[in-house]
From Swiss-Prot:
It is found in: Cytoplasm. ATP binds at residue 273. The lineage of its organism: Bacteria, Bacillati, Actinomycetota, Actinomycetes, Pseudonocardiales. This is Glutamate--tRNA ligase. A motif ('KMSKS' region) lies at residues 270-274. A motif ('HIGH' region) lies at residues 26-36. It comes from Saccharopolyspora erythraea (strain ATCC 11635 / DSM 40517 / JCM 4748 / NBRC 13426 / NCIMB 8594 / NRRL 2338).
Length: 503
């Protein structure tokens, strides 16, 4: 395979005036991962940018690996992310059905027509026989299929069947170079003879991905195939199959292909499905916003501009160009993902933030399943104090728990050990004395009283002076702004918590 710079010649049958039809076609196996979501996002944005359509198709022909649970997880993931589709499961469309398990008759018919036209041929060689032929010829036995069955006679086929062998169906690859203009990588050439004739149909009649994927793309009139770099090696086989499908009248064009860069994990290794950060729902459960996660995943191969990392999905749709996607591997950086999400959290309107944070406070045990109006009012009042400090929504559980703990309140043991030792006693006593005398319980009054009594009165630097007060009142060394938090808690609760460590 060679990849010279892109030339003016685009080896594709796509016409500029043909309406864009992109597709997202995962297999329902395991849990949706960020690489899969990045592919879905790029296809969705590409379709929307070009006023085209996105087809959602389920490639579920492997009964040993596919599951209904994984299928539902895919639907759940796309709904949570807000990536809708124009055709596919639960939506329908003129080219359905959109689950491959419901299209077996279609594949059987196409395979029959390709076989009758001589585009496919029956192959009986076993892997052991192929390796033996390579060894006998002094070649590497791992070279793969050697195209030896291309011209079997009817008598030879009958003899194999008499032995009880079932034929697989292979595509007859062309004897010339296959060149195409990759939308991401430029012009790519696979030399003649570098790709063995692939199996399209198993001996038991089951169609393989090598047949079903291009056939569905052809029948569904897909114009652009944007997918992971790991599928680049399958492209010459698919282009050859498209040529065959054109010759038998199934389609009249070949889509354009674009292969997206790998997503790497720590240590420059490809991000594994076993890595926690690969799991989409891990990020959702932590409290990522859909728009925050999509923004970060967009950056794994593309950028809106050199000096800007934070943007909305609408802004991405407006600016997206597939030709600006990088071909270089992208590394998943959790810290940067967190920073992007935090920026989106800060941008939320107050009511929007409240609606999103309450479920995390409920699941974290801070609020009951049915919060009271008084509890919601407290969250609403505290929201401006915590929203600026959150990385993910679940951080609100630790930051806001102190507002609702009531008689069960107790400082975090590690924080108490650090800030509520014997040397904290003078600070707490001074704070209680000053605050008891306050005529008004306001943020400004609390701040002035504490600074006068502790900082000025005891001669202690503010950072050290207020650590015992913060831990006694909020239970943590890191909390929302102290004076505002005490105003929210009220005089009685604040003073009770300040007195508790004094015994």
């Amino acid at each position: 395979m060679s990849t010279p710079e892109a030339t003016a010649e685009a080896v594709s049958g796509h016409e500029p005036n043909r309406a864009v039809r992109a597709r997202f076609c995962p297999s329902p196996t395991g849990t949706p991962h960020v690489g899969l979501v990045r592919t879905a996002l790029y296809n969705w944005v590409f379709a929307r940018h070009n006023q085209g359509k996105l087809v959602f198709r389920i490639e579920d022909t492997d009964a040993s690996r596919d599951s209904e649970e994984s299928y539902q997880a895919l639907l759940d993931a796309l709904r949570w992310l807000g990536l809708d589709w124009d055709e596919g499961p639960e939506v329908g469309g003129e080219y359905g059905p959109y689950r491959q398990s419901e299209r077996r008759d279609i594949y059987a018919d196409i395979a029959r027509r390709l076989l009758e036209a001589g585009e496919l041929y029956e192959s009986f060689s076993t892997p052991e026989e192929v390796e033996a032929r390579h060894r006998a010829a002094g070649r590497d036995p791992k070279l793969g299929y050697d195209n030896a069955d291309r011209d079997l006679t009817d008598e030879q086929k009958a003899a194999f069947r008499a032995e009880g062998r079932n034929a697989v169906l292979r595509l007859r690859m062309p004897e010339h170079d296959i060149t195409f203009a990759d939308l991401v990588r430029g012009e790519i050439t696979f030399p003649a003879g570098s790709v063995p004739d692939p199996v399209l149909v198993r001996g038991n009649g089951d169609a393989l991905y090598t047949l079903t994927n291009p056939v569905d793309d052809a029948l569904m009139r897909i114009t652009h195939v944007l997918r992971g770099e790991d599928l680049l090696s399958s492209t010459p086989r698919q282009i050859a199959l498209y040529d065959a499908l054109r010759r038998i009248g199934v389609t009249d064009f070949t889509p354009e292909f674009g292969h997206l860069p790998f997503v790497m994990g720590e240590g420059n290794k490809k991000l594994s499905k076993r890595d926690p950060q690969s799991n989409l729902f891990h990020h959702r459960d932590r409290g990522f916003l859909p728009e925050g996660l999509l923004n970060y995943l967009a950056l794994l191969g593309w950028s809106i501009s050199e000096d800007r990392d934070v943007f909305t999905l609408d802004e991405m749709v407006e600016a997206f160009e597939i030709g600006r996607v990088s071909s270089n591997p992208a590394r998943f950086d959790q810290k940067k993902a967190d920073a992007i999400n935090s920026a989106h959290l800060r941008a939320l309107a107050p009511d929007d933030f409240l609606e999103r944070v309450v479920p995390y406070l409920v699941s974290g045990g801070v609020l009951p399943a049915e919060p009271t109006e008084e509890q919601l009012a407290t969250v609403r009042a505290a929201a401006p104090l915590v929203q600026e400090r959150l990385i993910v929504l679940s951080d609100a559980v630790g930051m806001m728990r102190f507002l609702f703990d009531g008689d069960d309140f107790a400082p975090d043991p590690a924080s108490a050990e650090k800030a509520l030792g014997e040397d904290a006693r003078p600070v707490l006593e001074a704070a209680v004395s000053a605050l008891e005398a306050l005529p008004e319980w306001t943020t400004e009054a609390i701040e002035a009283a504490l600074k006068e009594s502790v900082v000025d009165g005891l001669g202690i630097k503010p950072r050290k002076a207020f650590a015992p007060v913060r831990v006694a009142v909020t239970g943590r060394t890191v909390s929302p702004p102290l004076y505002e938090s005490m105003e929210l808690l009220g005089r009685e609760v604040s003073l009770r918590r300040l007195r508790a460590p004094l015994g």
